[in-house]
Amino acid sequence: MTDKVRLTTMVQAAGUAAKLGPAGLEEAIHDITRSDDPNLIVGVEGAEDAGIYRIGENLALVETTDIITPLVDDPFTFGRIAAANALSDVYAMGGRPVTAMNLAFFPACSLPTSVLAAILAGGSAALKEAGTCLVGGHTVEDDELKFGLAVTGLIDPARVVRNCTARPGDLIVITKPLGTGIISTAIKAEMIEPEVEAEATRWMTTLNAKAADLMVACRATAATDVTGFGFIGHACEMALGAKVSFKIELARVPVIPGVPALIDDGMVPAGCYRNRQHYEQHVSGNSGDPLLPLFDPQTSGGLLITFAPDDARTFLSRAGKEGLFAACIGEVEPAGGTPIVFV
């Protein structure tokens, strides 16, 4: 029965596009203050991908959680994407995920438990690939289907990669193409070509593990993963946090083939426009529809990384030899004008 259920029709928004928008989130967490625990390395004070808590001289915990709604119709694939998406925050910090707990919100009155079983199986498959132990979980009966994980990783505190430490002169690299939110909208509307859906699914089920290992080995100066706030939103967080400007060559930003045609067909999620409304004040050099894929909320998106130029070239060379996708899309400049400048 699971192959007959269209999960995307049962939710209002798909994947990371279902997250609270940046403006609402900023207002909600404005009064939350950082803990004064001396072992807390990274907390709630910034827009980091995960928290970091020291438990030894050379060891710290990386802690994160992520929950999404279905953005594909197949339950197993949805579970796998949700797990890859949750693991990604640990990878973005340079950590190694070691344990995870399932978080499932399930409409038991409208779906058979076989659907939940398939979702959990997909999540477990991604965890097995990552070498991460599933240690438990929690379920809630809910009107809308959601699934995600709480993930704990390990890291050497001296090797944490933050999102606020890019330096002028660094080169900017991305490790996956954009457009999964737009494609998910088309899947829900049944206006998607099978090959475009397959390509998006391939990217969303690809773990950021190998790219993260190489990022750390090549001495990344800063990194984040591109998710619900879109490429521009997360690039803004990096630039504002480091008090620099990101000069981006728009033509070099990779987009999944088929996305421009879907934009022409109106397959743009509300989250894309919400991101544009919030972040367009931080952008100069271009505007309008060409930027829509860059505002698009991504699910299980790639890593956005900065390196010193020689290290960037090493990363790109090694990525090519190891069969990893990577594109150099710009450079970091001293702050001046807007945080994001397109050329």
From Swiss-Prot:
Binding site for ATP: K19, G46, A47, E48, D66, D89, G137, H138, T139
Active site (catalytic residues): U16
Record keywords: ATP-binding, Kinase, Magnesium, Metal-binding, Nucleotide-binding, Selenium, Selenocysteine, Transferase
Residues that, per the record, bind Mg(2+): D49, D89, D225
Gene Ontology cellular component list: cytoplasm
Keyword Transmembrane helix carried by entry: no
One GO MF term: ATP binding
UniProt similarity note: Belongs to the selenophosphate synthase 1 family. Class I subfamily.
Stated name of the protein: Selenide, water dikinase
